[in-house]
Amino acid sequence: MNIPYGKQTIEEDDIQAVVEVLKSDYLTTGPHVGAFEDKVKNYVGAKYAVAVSNGTAALHAACYAAGIGPGDEVITTPITFAASANCIRYCGGTPVFADVCADTYNINPQDIERKITEKTKAIIPVHFAGQPCDMDAIHEIAKKHNLIVIEDGAHALGAEYKGKKVGTLSDMTTFSFHPVKPVTTGEGGMIVTDNPELYQKLLLFHSHCITRDQSLMKGYEGPWYY
């Protein structure tokens, strides 16, 4: 038996949609990206969505928006793709691995509690194979220790936790549109959030801090007008 790594369903209307973009004035960013962001945020029930080039970039952007930097520790799972830990390193933080539950392969909240130190800044739970983690327990820990929660929902677009779609539960949630994910754009990623301050930071990160909003043009890191 030959089981494919991934098999996509590409139909004629998909091809025509790509042709439409290729014939338009926008090969990047553009109105189609904005429409896609709107569809995803409306589908999951979030207030804001920011599209990026892939799921790894989504995690990187979320860590940046969360203010993770040198000296910070972020707890995540070792049973995941490397990006779930690499995104922490990209921002100068240190990944700390908590063990998983034997029945779900999702991160174990009890071990999260054991791994918390005075340096812990955030938790990145990964919904293994699209199966949501025990978010109630994770949020209880995060509230107790004043931690940010970034859900890695790469495989979990459409998944629900106690009647709520993944993407509405935590400070930020990231999705991937790689060919082996529930929805694919070839490559692609997205971050959703209900927090307007995090949203502005995500927008700046995704556009190299370029903005035409003068109210945002302050601070050491930029932004800059383009």
Show the residue positions of the predicted features:
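Active-site region of PLP-dependent enzymes
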Residues: A156-K162, L169-Y226
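Conserved SAM-binding loop
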Residues: A51, T76, F97, P182, ...
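N-terminal "arm"/small-domain region of PLP-dependent enzymes with the aminotransferase-like
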Residues: M1-L27, P31
